[in-house]
Amino acid sequence: MASLIQVRDLLALRGRMEAAQISQALNTPQPMINAMLQQLESMGKAVRIQEEPDGCLSGSCKSCPEGKACLREWWALR
């Protein structure tokens, strides 16, 4: 089980990461990592970076059966 400090340190070492990458690197369930990232964000230590939809080649993300699964969400330290 990872701690909040380990999540922060991993982000410091690697720059920006997705929650799934952090979960895998720390061998911790993703819901727990999501909660830790939310806590770091509320403390002003981490920032959420969301990709813009202009990366969608077809421009049909709204009608995509996967919703907006092609839009990635990254986390980085402030």
UniProtKB/Swiss-Prot annotation:
A single GO molecular function term of this UniProt record: iron-sulfur cluster binding
SUPFAM superfamilies: Winged helix' DNA-binding domain (SSF46785)
Positions of iron-sulfur cluster binding: 56, 61, 64, 70
Superkingdom per UniProt: Bacteria
The family this protein is said to belong to: Belongs to the FeoC family.
Function: May function as a transcriptional regulator that controls feoABC expression.
Protein name (database record): Probable [Fe-S]-dependent transcriptional repressor
Gene behind the chain: feoC
